[in-house]
Structure formats: C-alpha cells, structure tokens
Amino acid sequence: DQGKLSHLDKSKLNFVIWTTTIWTLPGNLAIALHPSESYAVVKNNGNGEMYIMAEALTDKVMGVAGISDYEIVETHEGAFFENMLADHPFLPKTSRLVLADYVTMDSGTGCVHTAPGFGADDYQTCKRYGMDMVVPVDDQGRHTDYAGKYAGMVVEESNPVILKDMKESGALLASEEIVHSYPHCWRCKHPI
C-alpha cells in the first residue's frame, strides 16, 4: 500500500469487486478504479472487517450484503490507490490497483475485476500498465494450470466450485442471481 493505509489492519481490509463471470476470476490481474471518484473504507461494526468500494455505492452494496451496522471510516479519490497491491481471493498472487475512466457508479462496487485475457477494456488497461497478458483458459474452454486447483475444469462448471470455495474461505461478501445479456455466436448460438 506504499504506506498510505499503514494505520489500518491489512488482514481485515478488502477491495470489493463485483462480477457476473466467476470463471474469469483466476485470470484477474488488476482491480480498476475511477481516478476521480470517491472511494470509501467501510467498517463492518459487526466483525471489524473493512471494505473498500465506491462511496456512491456503499449503501447499495452493504444492503445486498445484508450488513446494516457499518460506518465509513475514511474516503479517498480512486487515484490514491493506484499501484497498490491486493491479495487475490483464492490464488497465491496479487492484483494491482489501476485507474480507468470507464469505471462507472451506476452498478457494482466501483472496483472492477480486470482480467486482460477476457475483455477489450481489461486488455487495454493492463497493457497501459505494462502488465503481462494472461489467458488461463485453453482452446477447449478449460482452465489451464494458471488457474490452480481449477485447472482442467470446463469454465462453466467451475463457477459453482469457485463460488463455494470463496464462501468457505470468507472471500465472498455476497452473491445474488441476476439476468443480463451475454454475447453469443450468431452462427452456432453458443456463448462466446
């Protein structure tokens, strides 16, 4: 954290990301924040855990998580966190905090899961920061060795396993079922 958050207990500090594609989490290399939006360090008064998320989305996120006893202990612009490192939720590696203007405050947490092998914005953002490109899925749609214990699993089949593991380890703040559009091949009608 470059000493910027040294006054906080790092073992209880978590950046909260939101994703609809759980299977892409092994490919996470970064967490994107909007440079000029306000981000809050939110303390769960029930267990002492602290979460970093967009200040504008705090009430919504904490509501989804079912946490009503919380307080904002400090706020910073997204640029404050640039180049900090966060532990990956289930792999022995870190994710870099990066800045991106495409991060919006209309949904999610304001902290965007960034996996350069799975999205154009993710790729461009990581490239801008000189990060390696990782595609931890092979041509058959299975996780590669980079995905650790999920190696060899078909990506769609790994979703419930990753979710279960995150719940059991305490790395999951909340989950909910949502319906949204997803790109499909116009010829074969399969997900891309």
PLM ranges: what are they?
Residues 1-26, 83-85, 93-98, 102, ...:
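Residue patterns forming the tRNA-binding/recognition surfaces of aminoacyl-tRNA synthetases
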Residues 33, 65-66, 166-170:
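Generic secondary-structure transition motif, activating predominantly at the C-termini of alpha-helices
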